[in-house]
Amino acid sequence: MAGLVVPLLEACSNPSPPVTGCVVTPTEEEGPFPYTPDGTTRSEISNPLNRTDVRSNYSDGVMQTGIPLTLNFLVVNTNGACSPVLGARVDIWHCNRNGWYSGYGGQSGGVSGTPSSYVGQTWLRGYQTTSASAVAQFITVYPGWYSGRATHVHMEVFMNGVLVKIGQVAFPETISDAVHVTTDYTAHGINTTRNATDSVFGNSGTDLANETLAMTGDVTNGFTGTYAIGIPL
């Protein structure tokens, strides 16, 4: 969301970070792999997903590998001049470097994995409540991809237990391409589905521009992605 991106240090230190422009984040499909254990509704999920570092499986601590990625989601009220929203719950989930999601056996399109073994696992999923600076931060790894989709992260926002936004965020392709030829990602290589032809992001160039993370960093040291979720509250 280029018009609403706030630099990391500014967003994390200023309780009322300024924004340039004020755009409602496009609503997108939830996707087939949200975390819903035992039929629990999304708004009722608590631990083990209340965490900043989402890289590990909660039950055994086994970590997903890949290039480090810090995600900073700023939540703003588009009905209030994009003022920061405190106390919003931001949920995220995404696939691992080989294109698989935790918690599901019936999936396809990834490589070098056994989806049936991922049932009951929780890696690369979590939620945080926006802090005094209206930022929810996550420590994760750069996602891979699976057939038919551009590289992406799913996100949802709840206010007072009510779902107020479902969305997905894309990555700049030049960065994804550089990541996906590094050692941890070579089993799949460069994503064959581009942002502009993706079934979610490809329907509007304007929406794609407003759904793309602002990225800093490199493949050696890792990346930081920043995104402002604009919601009319």
State each model region's role.
Residues N210-L233:
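C-terminal, well-folded lobe of enzymatic/effector domains
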Residues M1-N14:
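N-terminal export signals
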